[in-house]
C-alpha cells in the first residue's frame, strides 16, 4: 500500500523534525481520521486527516531563507521578559519559520530560517559536525598560548569541553580580530571560551552556516534560498 510515513508527514508540516514526530506518536497525541495512532511505520493516505494534539495539520511547502540578524534581538518566538525578538522585524509572512540554531542578543549575522523540521534537526543535532564561521573581535591582544588551548579544548562548563579553529586577522594591544570556526553547538560558546581567559568579546558576527554565507545582505535583510 502506497502512502507517506506518519513521521515524515508530520515533519513536512513544519511542526517538528521526524525524530520529534516519532516521540509525539509514541506519546499518543497523534490521530489519523479521529483515531490515535502509535504505529511508527503507519502510512498516511491521500484523503487521511492527521491531527497533533487535536489540531489538524497539513504538509507545507518547504521554505528556506537567510537573515542578517542585527544586535539587540533574541532568537526566539516569544520572550517572557518582553525583550525584542527577531520576529519583531521579520515580515509577518515568515512568522511560521524557525531559526536553525541561535545567536544571542548581542550577536549579529547569519541565521537560516525554515519550516523544514528535518533540516533543522540535521544541522543542529550534536552528532552532526556542521561548520559555523564567525568574525570575532575581543578587547585586547590574545596570547598565542590561549589560542592554542582553545584549539585543544577548554572546559567552559563542568564536563563540557569547547573547541574552536581560530585564524587571527588583526592584532594589536587594544584588540584582536579573528575568524573562528565551530563544529559544536554549545550555548554562548565563543563568549564563554574567551571569558575563561579573561577577554571580553566586543563583536561577534556569524558569516557562514554549513555552505550558506551571509554575503550580499545588510543588517535586517532577509533573502530566500533555493533548496539544494
Pin down the residues of each PLM region.
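Basic, flexible Lys/Arg- and Gly-enriched helix-loop patches that mediate nucleic-acid binding at interfaces
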Residues: 1-228
Amino acid at each position: 500500500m502506497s502512502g507517506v510515513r506518519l513521521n515524515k508527514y508530520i515533519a513536512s508540516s513544519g511542526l517538528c523534525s521526524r525524530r520529534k514526530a516519532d516521540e509525539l506518536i509514541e506519546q499518543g497525541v497523534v490521530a489519523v481520521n479521529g483515531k490515535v495512532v502509535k504505529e511508527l511505520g503507519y502510512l498516511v493516505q491521500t484523503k487521511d486527516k492527521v491531527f497533533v494534539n487535536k489540531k489538524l495539520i497539513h504538509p507545507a511547502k518547504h521554505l528556506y531563507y537567510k537573515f542578517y540578524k542585527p544586535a539587540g534581538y533574541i532568537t526566539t518566538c516569544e520572550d517572557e521578559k518582553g525583550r525584542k525578538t527577531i520576529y519583531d522585524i521579520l515580515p509577518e509572512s515568515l512568522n511560521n519559520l524557525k531559526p536553525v540554531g541561535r545567536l544571542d542578543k548581542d550577536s549579529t549575522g547569519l541565521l537560516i530560517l525554515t519550516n523544514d523540521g528535518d533540516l533543522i534537526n540535521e544541522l543542529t543535532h550534536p552528532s552532526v559536525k556542521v561548520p559555523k564561521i564567525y568574525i570575532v573581535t575581543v578587547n585586547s591582544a590574545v596570547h598565542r598560548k590561549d589560542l592554542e588551548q582553545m584549539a585543544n579544548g577548554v572546559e567552559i562548563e563542568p564536563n563540557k569541553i569547547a573547541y574552536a579553529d581560530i585564524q587571527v586577522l588583526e592584532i594589536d594591544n587594544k584588540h584582536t580580530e579573528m575568524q573562528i570556526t565551530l563544529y559544536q553547538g554549545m550555548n554562548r560558546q565563543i563568549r564563554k571560551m574567551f571569558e575563561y581567559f579573561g577577554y571580553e568579546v566586543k563583536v561577534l558576527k556569524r558569516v557562514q552556516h554549513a555552505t550558506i554565507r551571509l554575503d550580499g545582505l545588510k543588517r535586517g535583510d532577509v533573502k530566500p534560498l533555493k533548496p539544494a
